[in-house]
Amino acid sequence: PSIAAIGSENTESTSESMCAVVKGYPLVIRNSDSPEKQWGIPFDAPLFYWYREEDKERQLITYMEQTFSIQPSETKKAVLAGNDAMRQFGSRLKEAGAKVLEEVEKEGRYAVVLASRPYQNDALVNHSLPELLTEFGVPVLTADSVPGIENVDLSHSRLDVVNNYHARMLASAVLAAQSQNLEYVQFVSFGCGHDAYLSDEIQRMMREISGKSPLILKLDESEVQGPLRIRVRSFLETINMRRKKREMAERLQNQPGTSRQENAGGGNECGTAALGPDIQKSWQVHELSDPYSVKFEVEDRKKRTVLVPNTSHAFCRIMSAALKTQGIRAVPLAVGREEAIRLGKQYVHNDICFPAQIVIGEALAALRSGQYVPSETAIGMGKYIGDCRLTHYSALLRKALNDAGYPEVAILTNDDVDYHDLHPGFRMNLMSAIRLAGALPMIDILEELLRKIRPYEKVSGSSDQAFDEAMDFVVDGLEQHGFSGALRGFKKAIQRMNAIEYDRSQPRPRVLIIGEYLLNFHPGANHEIERYLEKNGFEIIEARM
């Protein structure tokens, strides 16, 4: 089955999406193994949306009745029994986790939280890591066995929590950072892009709460027992050394006649200062601060220039025009190429999708140019709440800006809810959305005309010049008079494109370009594949945006 949505099990109401990769597994199996064709075995791949328990019951009753002629009353009994079994299992798991935690606290030891996806419970996937840890004498807890995990406040995470497994990993990281008796290990397999932003955020949260560092392991099908043992042993030795220093510091602080102030340094080489600042920090647990402390306020509409990265340059221009209709000083960025890619690779996790790297790289390249004052600049970034990594571009951008030395740059998105309060001074309104929706088909048509004409133009470069002028008509009309202005501009744009001289008497072979959304339309990201193919004798067909 493909389960697209499931109810939240934590404090975040948005954590209803299921993994986009896992949702596609039935299609992968059907196309790769073809059980119907190869063995004549029926292959069912029903699609379910279980936002509530009632949804699950209703959809399963319908599926079982239509597919297997099972009576609704029988299916309802089975669903209730399954729910009861899951509740009992969850209770036993929490009890076992509480027992382990109680024991290590009593004995002054520590346990390790193994944060992973469900498939990483398989010994073939995790390379028997749980057994390796217990071999070293360290108890192991799964994230969902940690007591209180469902009640952890995740509002100060940079991420929008859209998945229950993400919530488990983040919440268990918070609890591990807050406890002297818990440490943290995260599994990552096949360079999962969703785990990439989780790894970044887990490290940030744990470091800010108590100075702890997690162990992040990338485990795939290759033989890793030797390197894995070394990594785990090094991690445990680091923890043991830190705990010994902590015990020494506590003994020094508790010595009769020795004040806390003396132990904080003050020339006393035997004080806790001699143990290092990282150890001193680990004594204290801090509340997470606002991860987006720099806001786009109302006054920033006049103060800040908003830089808009590209999907396609045409879309970037109409997005900027739509923002201008709401009083935003929006500037469409030039299409990023090698420098943008380099900066994106440098400041964005390399396991995240390439589109995130290129659009963030474009913003960083613009800031590096010296053309914009950081304190008077904001970056406009696309966003929606769901299972695509686009949900987390603003979090990736915030980290990249901070790491690159631009913490004063604000972020603005098209998210009308703005859960993290990035831009209290701006909400994209319905009229702007309507203007964008109306302008999108216009640029689709203009780009399609460009692709039909450019390979056959009589004057080299005339098609690109006409397209730029045609876009000016649409953008200026949208900016000055909204949708009606864009429509009038579009009519002029069509006339301008029709004025190009071309000869299609000898049609070229046509090539369809298909791929990841941004790579299709972004010439810097796809290394000008359209022009390359046109120079080599082809006409391009492109999916419409």
Language-model features: locations:
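An N-terminal assembly and electron-transfer interface module characteristic of large anaerobic redox
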Residues: P1-M545
